[in-house]
Amino acid sequence: FVLGDDDAILAPEGSSPQPWERDENATATINYTSGTTARPKGVQITHRNIWTNALTFALHAGLTDRDVYLHTLPMFHCNGWGMPFALAGLGVPQVVLRKVDGAEILRRVETHGVTFMCAAPAVVNAVLEAAQSWEGEIPGRDRVRIIVAGAPPPTKTVARVEAELGWE
């Protein structure tokens, strides 16, 4: 649905917004875990959880409205739960991948002017591998910042990202 284009579907004529009481502790979403550390479960996320998480992400990552974000993590990952809210709150454009592919990530960085992403170590390795056969200058040099999540990246990988990609 697109606001402005699909208003008749979203709010039929004659309807009006229903009154509601604001409650920062009310459940906003239920996110389902994959069960990597325990049995899978639905986790209730409150409006306050979302706000606090978004604010923390934005401050920690140094995000501004001049950034362009590339999603490489699944939306069910903990960064996937919080980062879209931080980005939307700042007005940051968000670029989404259908599947993780190192060369496609480099293309999106080049095409969309990506400045920031979060990625698992395996994704970083895929980008490093794709960069070896990339023709021309690596896109995003001295512009892209990356937060690696899911597991600590090996020191050699960090050094390669800085040296070969020019990313921070």
Report residues per predicted region.
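Structural detector for helix-capping/boundary residues
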Residues: 25, 47-48, 73, 112, ...
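ANL superfamily adenylate-forming
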Residues: 1-24, 131
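Conserved ATP-dependent adenylate/AMP-binding module captured primarily in the ANL superfamily
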Residues: 8-13, 53-70, 101-115
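Conserved coil-to-alpha-helix start sites within the AMP-binding
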Residues: 72-90
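Conserved pre-ATP/AMP-binding loop-to-beta segment of ANL
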Residues: 15-32, 39, 62-68
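Conserved S/T- and glycine-rich ATP-binding loop of Class I adenylate-forming
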Residues: 27, 33-36, 69, 75, ...
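Conserved AMP-binding A3 loop
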Residues: 28-52
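Conserved adenylate-forming
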Residues: 1-4, 89-93, 98-168
